[in-house]
């Protein structure tokens, strides 16, 4: 058990070091079994955080994203948080003025994360395979940059199915309606 943990820590350290040394614009910590975003990464990456535009934390065991994470990586354009245990986002997500795409599929959201509705550059929101029943339709309709909202495999209410062009200027992806069983 300790050996596997040590290997996981070493893998994360290697990925962070590669990003810092090569001054790349992305950090890929997908599939690292992270339960939280390691605090040590903030210090290790402080010289390059402004240049990080893409972060993948997909397929970990994250239960939350902190406001510190959002404010540290303020220049993000793409954020992949798919396959975690997230059920809400910090309000500070609204400060990500350059964020164009966020993948929150396969998480634990029961409601649409409303702070996303005020992220100005957001074009793509993927919330496939969550537990979302409520969607702030009016707020979504006013999102000028939004091009695609994926709500497939969510138990959304019938009002969401009424969101069609030209009422909303984006593509809304939903699972087909299940036929109602006949009595």
Segments from the language model and where they lie:
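Extended, charged alpha-helical interaction scaffolds
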Residues: 103-110, 116-118, 122-130
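The feature captures the LRR N-terminal capping module
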Residues: 1-82, 88-91, 101, 114, ...
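Solenoidal tandem-repeat scaffolds enriched in leucines and small polar residues
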Residues: 123, 127-133, 147, 153
